[in-house]
Amino acid sequence: MKRELLQKIMELRQQNVTQFFVACDYGVGLYAAEQINDLRKTDPDLMLFCKLPHEGQATKWAPYLRERYFKMLEDCTHIDCISLRAQPDAQLLAYQRIIDQSDLILTVFDSGASAAGPAEEKALAYALVSRKPVLNLDPYTLAVSRIDKRADK
């Protein structure tokens, strides 16, 4: 799945996408951010904007994940923190800010199931209502499909 995600990021870059926004969760968000930071080493026009739900997001993560997380933040272009402390809606607010600032949304979830959690489900609904194009990489089939309403037209 990581290889397919990197391939999709590189395809978007070839289509002149230079700015990537990531919510920096310990799963796909961290993988994507690390991949973008690696690409930035040879592509000075590429930018990574990290939208953190709150400052202590990684406090309870395993030490190896915290290490990767802080390295990723150190290497990114810009960090924006939604809240100083954890709030029930901070993750959703981070996703919404990303959606508002994006022309295209790239998601990773099992297209045969609902999104990973309530914040992710609400964020996907928000992207669709915002009429943003949404590309999804299915982590099991590795298929990329367009899931927004405009895909039907």
Task: Locate predicted features.
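Acidic/glycine-enriched connector segments
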Residues: M1-A151
